[in-house]
Amino acid sequence: MILKDLFTDISGFAEFVPGIDSNTNLSLLNSHAVTAYKRIANIVSVPVYNNIIKKGAGELYDHLRTALANLTMANDTVFDVLRKRKANIDIYKSEQEAIRRAYYENYYNAMDSL
């Protein structure tokens, strides 16, 4: 599981993404994390990605965690809206787009730092 390489639990994941629902779990997000991993590893290369994880705690590690978490959440935004609608929680399209943009901005900032 991609997320387990960088995060031990959802609270660790939540440190890097704003506004995450506390009912979310890492396994629910993993399919989006696979896509995020592929995009990030394609940019920085798989060996560099793995070296950052191997080195562990540090500035690059935090940038990688921020990038992966925010891109994962950006990819999950549409499905999060569906889950909320099933729970009878309305969300406006403009809110959804603002949330997605914020996640992408955080992702791009982290990738620039990497």
Language-model regions, residue ranges each:
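Catalytic-loop motifs flanking and including active-site residues across diverse enzymes
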Residues: L68
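Conserved short "hinge" loops at termini or chain/domain junctions
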Residues: M1-R65, F79-L114
